[in-house]
Amino acid sequence: MPYNAPPQLAEMSLFDIAKALEERRLPPIEKCNPEEEIDSRMRIAAGGTWFHDGTPINRPAMVRAFSSLLLREESGRHVLLTPQCRQPIAVEDAAFMAVDMLEKDGALAFRLNTDELVLAGPDNPLRAEGDAETPAIYLAVRHGCEARINRSTWLQLVEAADFVDGVPSVTSQGATFPLVPQ
């Protein structure tokens, strides 16, 4: 089955983005509770590259498939989850990278390195880590996993920021998020 990448984020309306989010089909991993655990021998590097046995996974379709099975446990450990087994996966920073952003109609939409779209808001908050000089911004994606905002997307985010009580912040879907650690 051929993969049809979504259109460029800048070409999409908020309605188009909402429709794409509604139509996305992800495996129901929240229903899985396997007892068996095996080592995935996989890791996600800080830059978003996926590796298996030390070799980069160069097929975007494979990365998209694996990422749909990803969950972060309460302990902070990331696992690939199927009905048959749980497979720990080493994540150096965040499971995803946010590589583009669109501000439209009071919402911030992000495209991830997997081509997935995420709307920041109460269900997918942004959080700032690090310090005021070198903040790291993260976006909640799903199942406890996050996306780190890459540098070019961070610059887009800064352009969209306003000062709220003296703190650079952005608002999306009625929720306001500071861009510096609090």
Predicted regions and their residues:
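Long, non-globular segments of proteins
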Residues: 1-182
